[in-house]
Regions:
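Hydrophobic alpha-helical and helix-loop surface patches within well-folded domains
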Residues: 1-119, 124, 130
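Beta-strand-rich binding/interaction modules
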Residues: 99-102, 110-182
Length: 182
């Protein structure tokens, strides 16, 4: 019952049941609010639960090795001192040489994106097409929303359970798709 997978499922249930509701309410706010009226209002599901999910997405985007390099650099720079979300993302960028400027929107934009996934398989051409789109509904604090950077991990299997290598235009591609447009 205490397995990693079961814990992950429980965390996702908390996110969907509580944090998504907070993100859709008049209390919606970004992970990194511009201002805090009352310090107790800062400790919310958005700051902690959604913030943790954003860090998991950075891990998915960068991969284990680059994420660990980023963590090491972050601790070297900020151990024992106050640090910000921007400090964390900067360490990840510097360690991996990956531009995360688009990804930073997760910290400044409130709301939960609605992700739509459509798939189609053509048996004649043996081609599988995946179409992913996103939109984030307006929130009281932000009427206009920008598309977020969503790393989308995917793996396909054949009838025998073997991994099918992903290709785009006949060339191998990474199993993490980067959704950056609406």
């Amino acid at each position: 019952l205490g397995s990693r997978a079961v814990n992950r499922i429980n965390n996702v249930r908390t996110m969907r049941g509580l944090q998504f509701a907070e993100d859709a309410s008049p209390m919606a706010h970004p992970i990194r609010p511009d201002m805090v009226i009352e310090m107790n209002n800062f400790y919310t599901l958005t700051v902690y639960e959604k913030g943790a999910e954003v860090i998991r997405m950075i891990h998915t985007l960068l991969g284990e090795e680059n994420f660990q390099k980023g963590m090491q650099l972050y601790f070297e720079r900020h151990d024992g001192s106050a640090a910000t979300c921007d400090d964390f993302v900067q360490a990840m960028e510097d360690a991996s040489n990956v531009d995360l400027s688009h990804f930073r929107r997760w910290y400044s934009q409130s709301g939960t994106p609605i992700v739509t996934v459509k798939d189609d398989y053509n048996p004649e051409t043996e081609q599988y097409t995946l179409t992913i789109s996103q939109r984030t509904p307006a929130t009281p604090d932000q009427a206009e929303k920008q598309p977020l950077h969503i790393p989308f991990a995917i793996e396909l299997y054949d009838n025998e359970g073997k991994v099918i290598p992903l290709q785009k235009g006949g060339h191998p591609v990474n199993s993490v798709l980067n959704v950056t447009q609406a």
